[in-house]
């Protein structure tokens, strides 16, 4: 009898060429977007010397992403998904070229940066939604947990590498190099994506796009299982906004500039460990209960984080949060894909991703408000323990999610 390993199995990259193409394209895309993410705030700060105008660019791009996720969900359920992915990526690349040309002007336009940020945020979201909706067809629903864990590792690795490369480019060549390489990387991602098979949506009656989107909302609200998963995801994303308190807590712990970096690295490190040790998650008989408990544990870790007497213990709490939130997120992703009808995958994935965007923004705003009334320690603890109380209530209320059972997939020799 073969025993399933705790470690993540990377065999999907060998056995599924289409997923391998997506993996490669996603990694290049994350690095490209990381170059952009470093360049835009630096350029606006250099042009205006205003942190408010820097924040405005983030807000505008986030708003465009939200709209793009809504529209992308409808398009992914209505049109051939490969075409939507390719169109979105190519259109994003055009926007990056625009940013590069604008940066080369003697006097770059701030308005152009904002407008191109709206452009890129919108079209990037279209591709994300279509790709999520297409994933079950690329790997099979029985491999979704494994695919999600590999994707999480890709995102974490790319998110670590790209800011470092972006910073070096800024120091040596200026923002135009960042934009130019981001555009080049985006167009390069089209090469592996062209090898994907056709990904048609399931046949369904034609209806007005708004009516189609409302149908997705109704399904989300009417399904205790899928709706509960989305709600937990939003709360978990709110908890991750604790990073806005890092500078203030660093002062409280009297941390040096070098030590502050450990706070920012702790959650990604914990999440990477969670993804690497997710080998048995797909074989859990009660994934809903495990999701609820791991979410509660992550809230407790945030509540304890601010109370730690030493910063190193705070880092341990953040790493624990990263690990538990990775477990919860992987279970959310897998259950959402398996419990959503094929005809609804685009819209539900769009709504699920959108709540991640809004949950982070709401969490940051709430923590900012708490920070104005409380000490940083009290703000962090209040947010964590407040979410823990809500989580306990959801553990009692979300009966269908708590009691959900699945038949674990059969373990083969290749899985060991």
From Swiss-Prot:
Subcellular location: Cell inner membrane
GO cellular component: a single term: plasma membrane
Alphabetical list of SUPFAM superfamilies matching this protein: MFS general substrate transporter
Periplasmic compartment residues: 43-55, 105-109, 178, 240-256, 308-313, 378
Keyword Acetylation: no
Membrane topology: Multi-pass membrane protein
NCBIfam families: PRK10489.1
HAMAP family given in the database record: MFS_EntS (MF_01436)
Protein name per the record: Enterobactin exporter EntS
Origin species: Shigella boydii serotype 4 (strain Sb227)
Source species taxonomy: Bacteria, Pseudomonadati, Pseudomonadota, Gammaproteobacteria, Enterobacterales
Gene: entS
């Amino acid at each position: 009898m073969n025993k399933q390993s705790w470690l993540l199995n990377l065999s999907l990259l060998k056995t599924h060429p289409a997923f391998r193409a997506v993996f490669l394209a996603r990694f290049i895309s994350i690095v490209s977007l990381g170059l952009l993410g470093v360049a835009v705030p630096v350029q606006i700060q250099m042009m205006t010397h205003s942190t408010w105008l820097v924040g405005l660019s983030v807000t505008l791009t986030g708003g465009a992403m939200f709209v793009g996720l809504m529209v992308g969900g409808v398009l992914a359920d209505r049109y051939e998904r490969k075409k939507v992915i390719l169109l979105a990526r190519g259109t994003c690349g055009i926007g990056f070229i625009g940013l590069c040309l604008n940066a080369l002007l003697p006097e770059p336009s701030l308005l152009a940066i904002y407008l191109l940020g709206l452009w890129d945020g919108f079209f990037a979201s279209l591709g994300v939604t279509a790709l999520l909706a297409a994933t079950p067809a690329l790997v099979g629903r029985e491999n979704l947990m494994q695919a999600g864990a590999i994707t999480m590792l890709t995102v974490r690795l790319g998110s670590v590498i790209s800011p470092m490369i972006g910073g070096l480019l800024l120091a040596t060549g200026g923002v135009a190099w960042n934009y130019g390489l981001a555009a080049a990387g985006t167009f390069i991602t089209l090469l592996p994506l062209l090898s994907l098979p056709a990904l048609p949506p399931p046949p369904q009656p034609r209806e007005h796009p708004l009516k189609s989107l409302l149908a997705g909302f109704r399904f989300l609200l009417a399904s205790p299982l899928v709706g509960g998963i989305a709600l937990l995801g939003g709360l978990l994303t709110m908890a991750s906004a604790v990073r806005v308190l890092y500078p203030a807590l660093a002062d409280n712990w009297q941390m040096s500039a070098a030590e502050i970096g450990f706070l920012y690295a702790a959650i990604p490190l914990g999440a990477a460990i969670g993804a690497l040790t997710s080998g048995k998650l797909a074989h859990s008989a009660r994934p809903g209960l495990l999701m609820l408990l791991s979410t509660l544990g992550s809230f407790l870790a945030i509540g304890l984080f601010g109370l730690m007497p030493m910063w190193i213990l705070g880092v341990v709490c953040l790493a624990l949060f990263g690990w538990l939130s990775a477990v919860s997120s992987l279970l959310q992703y897998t259950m959402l894909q398996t419990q959503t009808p094929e005809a609804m995958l685009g819209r539900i994935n769009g709504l699920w991703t959108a709540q991640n965007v809004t949950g982070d923004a709401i969490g940051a705003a709430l923590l900012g408000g708490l920070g104005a009334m409380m000490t940083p320690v009290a703000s962090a603890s209040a947010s964590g323990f407040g979410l823990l109380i809500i989580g306990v209530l959801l553990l009692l209320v979300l009966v269908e999610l708590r009691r959900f059972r699945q038949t674990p997939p059969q373990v083969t020799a290749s899985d060991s």
